[in-house]
Structure formats: C-alpha cells, structure tokens
C-alpha cells in the first residue's frame, strides 16, 4: 500500500515512522524547503513519550531533552499553590520531557530518513490539490520553483496543519 502524508511536522513524521514499523513505506510531502528547528519549547507528556519510545526514539530524545521532574504553580509572591511530580517521578514507566519543538521534529525527521531513505521526505513540495477515485488518490504537487507534478497513492493523510488542502 502506497501512503502519502501531507505535512512534515511532528504528527506527519511520527505517522511515517509508525507506518514503517508495520511494514509500509510512506512518503511525506512538506512545503517548507527544509526541516528547520523552529518553534518554542514544549512539554511532551508520558503518554506521547511512550509512543515515541515504541518507535525506538527514547534514547535520542533523552540525550537532548530535559526530564521534567515537577510541575509547580506559585503566586506572584512566590508561595507554592501546587506542586505535582511528573513522568517517572509520578510513577510512569517513561519520562515527561521538556524539549524544543524543532529539536523533536529534527529527531523524527532524522529517524524517517535513516529508516525509510532520503526520498521518504520530499521538502519544498507543496500539495495543491488531490482527487480520489475508488482505486487511488491523485496528488497535485508543486516542487519548489518547478512545474506541477501528479503522484498516485492508495491513501493520503493530511497532517499539514491549519492551512490544509
């Protein structure tokens, strides 16, 4: 089965790795000219980390992220309102990580290229439109500064955010 993923963000890249784990070879179309480490810090809860660990990424993430130990809320004068343990300190089998969003995306992109090959992520490829028949999905894609191309896949997953086609 040939699967296209529109969007090379955290969701699209994670999906590509999950599909590869079950024997499929998806292709990710990302309109940005390259995967860049942009964004802000995020907290990834143990439920998400468990999924990423199942994809074999725990060691890579642990080497660049901060294990979040405690969540603390304080008043403006510094008095504790609440303090709660997080991740392994809260009894989960995996940590909660604080990580830069772009660094997480980089780990995912590197894993996709390592496992599926350099053609698995097509950066600089904007999905313009798609049409579906009983047998296939046709994608109209414009590579950066080039002529529109058509690709045929069995399925298309939209992971391209709020401006999705």
What do these predicted ranges mean?
Residues 1-11:
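Beta1/beta-strand and adjacent pyrophosphate-binding region of the FAD-binding site
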Residues 3, 47-165:
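Conserved N-terminal helical subregion
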Residues 11, 34, 163:
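Conserved Rossmann-like nucleotide-cofactor binding loop
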Residues 15-24, 51-54, 115:
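A short, Lys/Arg-enriched amphipathic alpha-helix followed by its capping loop at the start of a domain
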Residues 16, 30, 157:
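Active-site beta-strand/loop signature of hydrolases that rely on acidic residues for catalysis
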Residues 20-40:
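Glycine-rich FAD pyrophosphate-binding loop
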Residues 34-53:
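Conserved N-terminal glycine-rich FAD pyrophosphate-binding loop of Rossmann-like flavoproteins
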């Amino acid at each position: 089965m040939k699967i296209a993923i529109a969007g090379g963000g955290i969701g699209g890249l994670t999906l590509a790795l999950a599909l590869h784990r079950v024997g499929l070879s998806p292709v990710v179309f990302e309109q940005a000219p390259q995967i860049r480490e942009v964004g802000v810090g995020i907290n990834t809860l143990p439920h998400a980390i468990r999924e990423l660990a199942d994809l074999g990424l725990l060691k890579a993430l642990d080497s660049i992220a901060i294990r979040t130990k405690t969540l603390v809320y304080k008043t403006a004068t510094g008095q504790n309102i609440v303090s709660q343990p997080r991740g392994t300190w809260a009894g989960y089998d995996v940590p909660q990580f604080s990580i830069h969003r772009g660094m997480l995306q980089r780990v995912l992109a590197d894993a996709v290229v390592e496992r599926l090959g350099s053609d698995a992520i097509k950066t600089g490829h904007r999905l313009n439109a798609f049409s579906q028949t009983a047998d296939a999905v046709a994608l109209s894609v414009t590579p950066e500064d080039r002529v529109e191309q058509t690709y045929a896949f069995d399925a298309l997953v939209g992971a391209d955010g709020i401006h999705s086609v």
